[in-house]
Amino acid sequence: MKLKIYTLLIAFCAAWSLHSCDNDDDESIAVPAALQEAFSSKYPNVKNVKWETKAGYYVADFYDGYEASAWFTMDGNWHMTETDIPYTALPDPVKSAFEASDYKTWKRDDVDKLERQDIETVYVIEVENQNQEVDLYYSADGVLIKSVADTDDHESDHLPTTQLPATMKTFIDGKYAGARIVEVDVEDDKNDWNFGFTEVDIIHFDSGLNRNVSKEVLFDKGGEWYSTSWEVRRNELPAAVTNAISVEYAGYQMDDAEYFEMATGTSYYQIELEGNNSPDIDIKVTADGTILK
């Protein structure tokens, strides 16, 4: 009987150790020599380091002026460093953009600096208002890249980005000259229509708008360009678009607007309309004021 119990305990412990290896914060984990050398080379002045494993990466938690976490693969290849910084340490353009945004009155919860392999540094301001929490992603020059509802699922927060295929990089360089890549993600929700598509966020100077714009470039499962979209301010909408809406949708107010370039050759504005006593609706309008049905 004792032997059976002992055997069961061994089996349970083995199963538990396998289950926990995806997120292991045991200080005794073995860190390969190549990884130790890579970390010391990148952060030569850091002394006290605590290693853990997350999502298949080795993560070094340390203090170097601020609390930080550096993500590596087993062979010593660096992928990301996340640094917890005070609001005052943000670049001035980021602070100015935030303080002029719709979120300026929200409570600031946390600020992170994300440095990742082969892409631009991104700053994330976590804000909350009553039961709502939002992560605001900014480039160093103050362009709002995206706003994401915070689900408190910290296991998936700020993971290293997907490696961008060379063919996609070449396409972006050709179509959007001078663009800076700030985010790469593959849609993994099987319930979404674009499951398996690659989303690439870029900062691109738009000569028509005469400003830097955050654009989302979408590639299909085969790696072919599918579409590019970006937010448009109301005062940037063509007069033909606003006139068509005022005629066809009297009583509605324009809210958010996005511009879409499609690989099919069509382009249009997608505009959210708010009605006083009617449900909100989304419409598509071409630059000449044609409303697409």
Can you annotate each of these PLM segments?
Residues S28-K293:
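First exposed extracellular module after export/assembly in secreted or surface-exposed proteins
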